[in-house]
Regions:
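N-terminal subdomain of nucleotide-sugar transferases
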Residues: 1-63, 98-100, 236
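Conserved catalytic-core segment of nucleotide-activated headgroup transferases in glycan assembly
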Residues: 27, 194-244
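A short, charged, and often flexible helix/loop element on the N-terminal side
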Residues: 64-92, 144-152
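Membrane-proximal helix-turn-helix segments that form the acceptor-binding/catalytic region
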Residues: 93-94, 132, 144-172
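Short N-terminal targeting/anchoring amphipathic segment
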Residues: 94-112, 123-125
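Active-site proximal beta-strand in glycosyltransferases
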Residues: 102-103, 119-140
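A short beta-strand/loop micro-motif in the catalytic core of glycosyltransferases
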Residues: 103-104, 152, 168-176, 242
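Helix-loop-beta element that forms the nucleotide-linked donor phosphate-binding surface
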Residues: 118-121, 164-199
Length: 244
């Protein structure tokens, strides 16, 4: 039997979700905001690596906990995927066990404790924003660096194996219909729903006519965005408007 605490929710975030300035944290932040607006009491757990603590999150949540991401060679040599094993704080588990509220794991990155026996009586929800092993496979194919190629292929293999832990979730919330279909096919014992990305735009604000340039916006430290930017640069001379 799954025990829940009504109107309270633990959210485990892969990063500090404010400011909401890139894709993953935009979804997390505006989800927190939407839930808080509906009167849900949120206990937020953030893995921290480069982004500072934020008063904005304290204002929205009942409590906010921050944990260091355990990066380095030891985490990279684990049988678990690096993006997951480096997010394994025992303090997180201790805080999750302080009550019986449901737990929302934001992305496979945060699912180190998803299958932990101490959480077996808890309602566990996973927000799936990618099919991670596919994503890392494409990153491996896209890079020219031999070291990065080996790392991405290894991480893809480990993610494919670790993904089987999703069978311990009660719900998977996919961000696209394609991912919903994938997870529903591979994990028939789990309830899979499609809930599109949360964001701050409440209505379309487009102006009549057309603009004077194409704008590319992306975090260039992410290889996928870097490769896209390079392709667009090659296409730029053929475009009818300037590319910014």
């Amino acid at each position: 039997m799954v025990n829940t605490m009504e109107r309270r929710l633990h959210i485990v975030s892969f990063d500090v979700p404010y400011p909401a300035d890139y894709g993953g944290v935009i979804d997390v932040y505006y989800k927190i905001k939407a839930l808080a607006d509906q009167g849900v009491s949120i206990i937020l757990h953030c893995y921290q690596y480069g982004r500072p603590e934020q008063q904005e999150l304290e204002d929205l949540c009942e409590r906010v906990y921050y944990y260091p991401r355990l990066r380095g060679i030891f985490s990279a040599l684990s049988r678990e995927p690096y993006i997951i094993y480096s997010r394994r704080s025992q303090n997180l588990l201790s805080h999750l066990l302080e009550d019986d509220a449901p737990i929302l794991f934001e992305g496979l990155h945060t699912c180190h404790f998803l299958s932990h026996p101490a959480l077996s009586n808890r309602l566990r929800i996973v927000r799936a924003c990618n099919i991670e092993h596919e994503y890392y496979h494409y990153l491996a194919k896209g890079t020219r660096s031999l070291f990065k190629k080996l790392y991405f292929f290894l991480e893809s293999y480990r993610l494919r194996l670790f993904e089987k832990n999703l069978r311990y979730a009660h719900y998977i919330l996919a961000i696209t219909p394609r991912e919903r279909d994938y997870f529903a096919h591979h994990y028939p014992g789990v309830e899979v729903q499609w809930i599109s990305g949360f964001h701050g735009d409440q209505k379309v604000k487009n102006q009549p006519g057309k603009g004077d340039y194409f704008l590319f916006h992306g975090k260039l430290s992410v290889l996928e965005n870097e490769l896209t930017a390079k392709r667009l640069i090659r296409l730029a001379p053929q475009l009818p408007l300037p590319l910014v």
